[in-house]
């Protein structure tokens, strides 16, 4: 699948947040201030219309999870088809992606690194190797690092980094075994308040 290969810090500065989790892995150069807009001196951000605000929120969430436009729209369509709140359904689908679950369990330092582990066949789901990043993990699925990948220094480093983060309540992780259980889908209260999914629903509902 195609993926964005351009300057990631520039996108983070545009959205005003660490989209790609770089600051948790290494110190970001002081010249690359996330809160400052792209440009030599941080171009002044234009005043956005309602549509512009909705579009910017969609772009932010899409980039956080590393999903391209067509796939993101398909996630929205599936979320709208399911029972319940469309915005919350959308976030649950994104959180259920295998690459995201691998990141949440602490096996990858960033979602991009977790996606690479999946594509390199380093991740096992219920005893079977799965190399599709968008694979939807279901409640009670067991996700683990493949035996021959457990010695990788990046996996060990990621687990150490994960110890500094708040542990997701919807997951159960045995760091020593490099194995975890997806106990349930996360509830809205479990996830970041920095995301306004209602704006995305408004955008796609037009």
Curated annotation (Swiss-Prot):
Gene3D superfamilies given in the database record: Ribosomal Protein S4 Delta 41, Chain A, domain 1, RNA-binding S4 domain
Any one of the GO BP annotations: ribosomal small subunit biogenesis
Keywords, alphabetical: Ribonucleoprotein, Ribosomal protein, RNA-binding, rRNA-binding
Ranges for domain S4 RNA-binding: 96-156
Keyword Plastid: no
HAMAP family assigned to the protein according to its UniProt record, in alphabetical order: Ribosomal_uS4_B
PANTHER family given in the database record: 30S 40S RIBOSOMAL PROTEIN, SMALL RIBOSOMAL SUBUNIT PROTEIN US4M
Protein name: Small ribosomal subunit protein uS4
Organism name: Edwardsiella ictaluri (strain 93-146)
Taxonomic lineage from the root: Bacteria, Pseudomonadati, Pseudomonadota, Gammaproteobacteria, Enterobacterales
